[in-house]
Amino acid sequence: LLNQDIDYTVHGELSVNLLDQEHFESHKEILKRDIEVSGEIKASHLVTHFGQTINNVHENKELYASHLMKQQECYAKMGEYAKSNNVTLAIENLFPFTHNHYAPLPSEIAKQINEINHPNVKCCLDFSHAYINCTHRNAHFINEIKMMGPLSEHIHMHDSFGTIERIWTYIDAE
């Protein structure tokens, strides 16, 4: 690919979750290695997922805020590391994989990315994930994507009915 006149993106592991405090250091190390690989193969962007957690953690506002702050500090540091590797992080929105999980809405992600305010920390707006999450949380889809859209340097578009756990899927995340 290096002899082609194209830009390309690496999609990092779905499992990286910087809101998972129990395995935070492992998630951070995987993200760091993804940045290194992306830089080595000259990818312009690395898509990685904004963290998600369980409802009980989200409902404890003080605990959730501390998890968000730790993730934000990590993204700021990883933004510098990405910059040194000529890579931009494209942080993708998710949806809750089950009814017991909490995935932040696009507006919540946009708020954190704006607070980080780093040229190498941007967004990947996944329209279907946003639709599923907005439907699940009864949030206004268009208003939500308007918040994240201007920060997005990469997008994902695919079909979705906007629901979770209604039919069998090949893997849970599907």
Language model features: what each stretch is:
Residues 9-15, 43-45:
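Long, hydrophobic/aromatic-enriched structural stretches that serve as scaffold segments
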Residues 14-18, 53-57, 131, 161-164:
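Conserved radical SAM core fold
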Residues 82-173:
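Acidic/histidine-rich catalytic cores of soluble enzymes
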Residues 20-123:
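Active-site acidic/histidine proton-transfer and metal-coordination neighborhood
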Residues 8-9, 125:
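Active-site proximal beta-strand in glycosyltransferases
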Residues 1-2:
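Glycine-rich, proline-tolerant flexible connector loops at the mouths of alpha/beta enzymes
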Residues 11, 48, 157:
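Short glycine/serine/threonine-enriched helix-capping/active-site loop
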